[in-house]
């Protein structure tokens, strides 16, 4: 008998790809349809809207009596979805028992939230973890029911180590990569019987507390690239519900089309400035811990034949082509203006400015400076629990600048980001401002980062959708 092949691919499937029992069956067909020489690890998100339902259940539990928690609509919906899925997939009794145990633990956690009348960040992470823990158990059991050896793994237990910043934890890379390598060493060197590992995405373990943490919205993408980097693979695949990374948001721009190639830098900028197809930090393991040797391919689980998008360290930039790769929109940002003549020639002024933002717990996106002023944008917290900045937070920020600088803020703006060849910025901006002038759109602020791949324009929210469409037509003709 031939020696077992080592793991040579990591594939991640998002929530929409595993939203129902039928979708899980489709994903299983994809996994089983790889060439015989391909041995994958499968990373899964929670089923469909499960994460949102878990968040809703947590909020509802705060307003419910402990005795009524079991009848919460969101909790009933979660139980119904997973029980129906288990029945449709015809999983074994042991998996059903495991599922019911998790659903009981979920109910008990919600009762505790109701009793304590508190939903701490730590409790939130524990709460939403049930989505991935349930989906992976059901999917792994379905593979086994089809006669395919498979084992389920919870990422917090196999080595995804983070700090203890609950709801948006940062990965401890050296610890994580080492532990993941150790976990799967037997499957890499052929000393263990071949099986398809099915791993929870999105979850980690706090280094100090040992508690479950989460990696922020879309964190399963990061789990995927972490595994690929740890195992030294040539490629990982992130399967979504679109044909790869697109030239714009297809929900806004009808003519958005797939981008064939991207660099890690371009993909990171896209994710950070509004493209929801990838987690902003998911490129970091590939770019920094494989020396750029690992590619990330984005594929469509609803359209397997689509080529998708390959993201790599470098790509060819055809002269005269690829002026703009994609245009993305981030809405509902706040614009802050800081003015002080003390900036003139003063060492450390900007450091003091950013220390104030740090002490206020506010994240800065885009920055533009002049001799006596700084303008920047603030974004809602980049976590699973996104929300609007509230007036009290902004007023606290204004007060923190008392005696330092004159500060004001304006709400209701959007960041329109052109992921582009900045070496051609003169041509790009000439065309951009010609269109904006024609459409009577005023730019409140502009920033061109050191990355050489992004130009950010700050415009009013109420003009953002139309502006995105006309600029997309200008550069992509659709």
Give names to the regions the model predicted.
Residues 305-478:
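A conserved regulatory-domain signal marking ACT and ACT-like small-molecule sensing domains
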